[in-house]
Amino acid sequence: MSNIDKVLDKGYIEVVDVLGDDLTPVNAARVSFGGRSKEFTSKDRRLSKFLIKHKHFSPFRHQHVMMIIKAPEFVMRQWYKHVVGIETTSDHPTKDHAWNEISGRYVEYSDFYMPENFRAQSEDNKQASDGLVDNQEGAEDLWNNAQRNSIEAYEKMIEMGMAKEQARSILPLTVYTQVWWTASFQSIMNFIELRDEPTSQVEIQEYARVLKKIMLNVFPETTKLWQEIYWDEQE
């Protein structure tokens, strides 16, 4: 299985493999009674809704998605902080994941993020943006010059034989990186819930929205129920 959804100018999320389906959590829950369904029925939907509504989440950790994510380094830093935050909170129920990232010690970076516009700093929220910078052309020139200088210096260092592990340290956070991320349904929904909301950075919101679309495709019934119970009520 391989489906690629584009994000930003050069990024994407590629689904490599999926473990389980909409029946997986309800059958996992029924194991206590030795029951098992072969087709997803209205009865299964009611059980799945009950499990989600009453926060019986362990059955939803049997559904997994393996994906390749290509994103700017500043987006991936936020993403990994989310993953690590889950992992190190001992009483949090969503620790299940695997994360492996491409290494600049072995490969040369070539893709860099270029935004469509340049946002202004919010006056009310120190970590958010609001509206656009008045001088868009000037901002673009500064962005391009800073990025070009870093890239040219990086390439020259590689040409002169400098170790990649050292030369990469001057690259801007706009450099695109790649990771393999395998996570449970519950872990992914937790990420979407926290990152597809107005106070998150715009770029990571875009990845969260694409991820939501992917989940509606691979686990349609379970995702719709989760959205109905937790997200639609908040809107």
Can you describe what each PLM-predicted range is?
Residues 1-235:
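Family-specific signature for flavin-dependent thymidylate synthase
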